[in-house]
């Protein structure tokens, strides 16, 4: 395989496959003190989440599997009735339907990946940004 065997993608091609969430997608409030840039298809949702110290995610469950990558900060995750302290560099896996929640100890940035997509998050996006584009929904 050689680079010269391929054409350089144009801007229209790029827009079909690539998005810069922090520049192109408005923040959606998930819970008070926690906002996210959401990228979604039918197969997955990626949440670029910023959580303020003192934020709380009540214990809940959902039918999606979840992988959380902690980029900055620290939080206490409640998983199946136990508290797990996680911080920058940790990767957390939550199988579908496992009860979980979180206490945000200090400002924290994470990337959450959900499979399949979080329709409830996309509904929040649409409610908060009715005139915005929902990236990748038709890819």
Show the residue positions of the predicted features.
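A short, N-terminal "cap"/entry segment at the start of jelly-roll beta-barrel domains
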Residues: 1-43, 127-139
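Anionic, Ser/Thr-rich low-complexity intrinsically disordered regions
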Residues: 63, 79, 111-112, 117-125, ...
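Short acidic-glycine-tyrosine-enriched beta hairpin
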Residues: 81-96
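Ligand-binding loop in jelly-roll beta-barrel domains
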Residues: 96-120
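Conserved short histidine dyad/triad with adjacent acidic residue
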Residues: 32, 46-61
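A cytosolic small-molecule/anion-sensing beta-strand core signal
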Residues: 71-72, 87-88, 106
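Short, conserved beta-strand element in jelly-roll/cupin
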Residues: 50-52, 61-77, 113-116
């Amino acid at each position: 395989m050689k680079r010269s065997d391929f054409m350089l993608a144009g801007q229209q091609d790029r827009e079909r496959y690539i998005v810069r969430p922090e520049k192109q997608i408005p923040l959606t409030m998930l819970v008070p003190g926690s906002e996210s840039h959401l990228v979604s298809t039918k197969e997955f949702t990626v949440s670029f989440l910023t959580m303020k110290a003192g934020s709380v995610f009540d214990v809940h469950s959902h039918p999606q599997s979840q992988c959380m990558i902690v980029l900055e900060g620290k939080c206490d995750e409640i998983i199946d009735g136990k508290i797990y302290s996680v911080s920058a560099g940790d990767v957390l896996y939550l199988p579908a339907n496992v009860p979980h929640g979180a206490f945000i100890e200090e400002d924290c940035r994470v990337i959450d990946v959900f499979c399949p997509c979080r329709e409830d998050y996309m509904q929040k996006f649409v409610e908060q940004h009715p005139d915005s584009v929902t990236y990748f929904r038709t890819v």
